[in-house]
Structures are given as C-alpha cells and as structure tokens.
Amino acid sequence: FHTIYWPIILMALGEPLPKKVLGHPWLLMNNDKMSKSKGNMLYGDDLVRMFGLDAIRYYLLSEMGYQNDGNISYDAIISRTNIDLANIYGNLVSRTASMIKQYFGGIIPAPSANEEVDTALIETVRAEAKAAYDLLDKYYLSDAATHIIALLKACNKYIDDTTPWMLAKDESKRERLQNVMAYLVEGIRTATTLFTPYMPTTAENVAKLFGFDTSLDKLADFKCDFAGNTVGECGKLFARIDKAEFDKQLAKEAEEKEKKALEGKIDIEDFAKVSLV
C-alpha cells in the first residue's frame, strides 16, 4: 500500500511524494510465524498489562532490526527486561540516586579534577553515545540499543572501579567522590536521552529524578550543568520478573480463559434434545 497505492493517490492529489518509506521485517513467536490456528498469538494489550508499555516498546525496538526478522517470546521479554532494564539501567539509576542522598544529602555535586579512570569513562560514554546516535539517525534502533547498554555497563563498571562507598569513609577523598557521583549522573543522562525514543515515560521520569535536561545538544558533554539539583524520590524503574511466578500466573489466566469459553455451552445430552426443523 505505502509504496504503490499511496504514491498514486498523492500524485493524483498533486501532493509531494515521500522520499523514504520505512518498513520492518516479520515478528516471529518462538521463531515461528504467529497464527490463530497454531494458538501462538500474542496481543499488544496483554503484553502491556503483563510487562508495562515501556518495557514492551524497548523489547520490540531493541529486538527487531531492519535486516532480519525479530523474535518474541515470554522468556525473551523476561530475560531482556531483567538484564537490560532492571539490572543494568534501573540498578544504576537507583544506586546513583541512593549514594547522592547518602553522601551529599541529595544534592548532586559538581566534579573537580579528573583522574585516569574518569577520563576513560568520559571517552567510553562519548564513543558509545556517538555510535548509538549515528545508528538512530539511520533508524537502526536495534543496533543502537546495543551501544546504549554498553554505555550503561561502563557506568556500572566505573562504580566498581572507583568504589564510592570506600571514598565516602575518607574525608580527604571528598572531591574524588564528587567526581564519581557527577559523572555517573552524566552517564545516566546520556543513556536516558538516547533511550527517549524507546521508553519515553521512563526517560521523562529519570530526567525528573535528577532534574537534568535531555536535549541532544547536551549529549555526553560532561559539563554537569545539573550540579546543585536535588535528587527526587527513586522507586524501582523496572522490577525483576520471577519466571516461576510469571509461568504460574500465565497458566492460571489460560485456565480462566478456557473456563470462560466453556460457559454457556451445552453437552451432547442437551444437544440431543434439540429439535432441528
């Protein structure tokens, strides 16, 4: 339709023709085509109810590239939600917000002199952000997501390398601790800005939490213009999904649907009493 009939209609109306038409491949269920007859259909409203809108948006956009078919399954959604969103992104946001509250009374500090580990983080964040931005500009959202996650992993590694809980015990390391907190927030801001097309609501909530701007012109600039902002209350961005509990709930819902479908139906004895004219 969009490459044959739509251009014909536009030409007939004298309207300008599209310069680019975006398409995407198939979405498979457990690497198989979805079909009602196979009983492997998934519906958007059910997925949103089970996992949340942003988690589903992220899964689909990070799973489906333009080159190959995408695959969807409950197990795959749970795995990506738990690893990418709960462990890598959500945990980083939660830890950073908690440490700023604990060590600086909730006020985001300004950075001071850099050390080698700081410079390494800045270079990694900028490199991954540029790679992600360039891919997003070409609509390669799946590939871009890989670089955003790599950026977040670098921030989590930065925490392990700098051990802020140890710095907090030594007053002479106060400025080092300021650097760590400020640069963690800058890393989160960069990832959150890039995540906006994937998870708009989550990105907005994280931006409000730290009070930072997610404008693209500030992407990975490391000027930390949010210093002095007060960190808000941080709940869990994404709760980890217990696979066993999910399977139990899924089986219960399937049983209830089957029971509901049988309601109102008559058995063979009742059918035999029916007079067909």
Give residue ranges: language-model regions.
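Basic, alpha-helical terminal appendages of large translation-related enzymes
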Residues: 134, 138-139, 149, 153-277
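Long, charged, glycine-rich C-terminal linkers/tails
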Residues: 19-26
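Short active-site loop/helix that positions an aromatic residue
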Residues: 3-13
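Short, hydrophobic/amphipathic alpha-helical patches that form generic packing surfaces
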Residues: 7-9, 57-64, 189-193
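Catalytic adenosine-cofactor/nucleotide-binding cores of aminoacyl-tRNA synthetases and other
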Residues: 26-119, 210-241, 245
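Conserved, charged catalytic cores of large soluble enzymes
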Residues: 93-132, 152, 156-173, 248
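Secondary-structure capping and boundary motifs in well-ordered enzyme cores
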Residues: 1, 36, 47-49, 77-88, ...
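Short, charged/polar, low-complexity loop and linker segments
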Residues: 69-74, 126-134
